[in-house]
Amino acid sequence: MSKKMNSTPKKDGFWMPGEWEKHDQCWMIWPERSDNWRLGAKPAQRVFANVANAIAKYEKVTMLVSHQQFENARNLLDQNVRVIECSNDDSWMRDVGPTIVKNKDGEIRGVDWVFNAWGGFKGGLYFPWDKDDAIARKVCEISNIDYYRTDFVLEGGSIHTDGDGTLYTTEECLLNENRNPDLSKEQIEENLKEYCGVEKVIWLPLGVYNDETNGHVDNLLHVVSPGHVVLTWTDDTTDPQYERSKLAYDILTNTLDAKGRKIKVTKLHQPGPLFITKEEAEGIDVCDTMSREPEQRMPASYANFYIANNAIILPIFGDKYDDLAVKTLQSVYPNHKIETVMAREILLGGGNIHCITQQQPTTK
């Protein structure tokens, strides 16, 4: 039976493993919000199904879905995808699900962060968010794993780790006054070390341009292995993303990781830029929080991919840089199959494949 722990992962000898380590399964949540997903979320649901079905070729997938959408999800998903009825507010499993940590014996536990919809009452994207804040605990209870409940606001997409002592994040997100305003940078870093079991935090100034999550690091870069990352890039110095990526590149290439390694940075050219069309904007129900206007630039990125067992599930956009992204990632993941999914519909909702997935590492 799952139980809540009163210590911290670091004190108990647990740490956040690298995402490339073997998984038992992947968790997702079915989309249905009509104020975030166009045309009643029908186009997004088809793409979520494509993502889940692609991952399910390599590892187990569990899809959480509201009771209203259970039959629809079951019909669109392959039979080897497990579907479980579970109340939710939206479908960003990376941000609301548990961060799974492990110890040297292969035991796993979950970290249940506080979720406030990317800002609470100071710029948050929807209200209420209590169902989403309960997702991490529910996942742990379904999986029968113990968990730590923190009093620290954090989304899973705002951190990346190399599984070997180093964590990457952005100041734009974690130091934003709408997350943990009463904590200093040093206190925030201490929380990351205690609950992710890391030794060093590498702070990057900014995420991807116009990212409504306040610059999540998982849209900016992905960790390939200890001492190696792929970084969203553009050579266009007039593009607002250029300065953001250049700042990150300069810090990464002049910083040693927790084990004293120089960090290798592989540039991953961004798509587009891509913009919301008038037709797409008109298909989304108007609300007071989430902005979806015609000609609004979207935070498109190829770094927002999922590492499955022996495969990379990569978002593509029908863009001229799609083939280059596949080639770049195949070069850094020579033993993985690159599975592409047309993912513009996820991008229209504000994120991409990494944002809608959460891995559960294998136990020994």
Swiss-Prot record:
GO terms for molecular function: agmatine deiminase activity; protein-arginine deiminase activity. Pfam families: PAD_porph (PF04371). SUPFAM superfamilies: Pentein. The keyword Zinc does not apply. This is Putative agmatine deiminase. InterPro entries: Agmatine_deiminase (IPR017754), Peptidyl-Arg-deiminase_porph (IPR007466). Its EC number is 3.5.3.12. It is an enzyme of class 3 (hydrolase). Belongs to the agmatine deiminase family. GO terms for biological process: putrescine biosynthetic process. Keywords: Hydrolase. The active site is at C355.
